[in-house]
Amino acid sequence: MSKSYKMKSKSYVCGEWVEGELNGTQVNNPVTGKIICTVSSAGVNFEKMTQYARTVGGLGLGEMTLHERANAIKNIAKYLLTKKDHLYQISSKTGATKLDSWVDIEGGLATMFSYSGIARREFANEKFIVE
């Protein structure tokens, strides 16, 4: 098996991008067999991640109103939309056609935009929902 390039995939952990400590598992292009990257969670402190999510991420979201959260989702979708050509390029390495990928990429982004709009239209601009 020839290799076109090899990179270590990173994970977003406790506010920063980190690589696993070991070489990890190879991720191969299913069409060509070439190595795309390696991925490893060795050395990642999952207990610390859970605590970070509860004390930093969760608190941060709790401070946002529902409209602010909806706008954050919309802004992420807008950013990802600027990267859609790159996302199609990556998706092609899975063996998917552009049409296959369209459902996941543009369909997923459309869902994000839709949920954002629904939240802003149907929920009060508060930090909570009264049911």
Predicted region positions:
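N-terminal Rossmann-like NAD(P)+-binding subdomain of aldehyde/semialdehyde dehydrogenases
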Residues: M1-E131
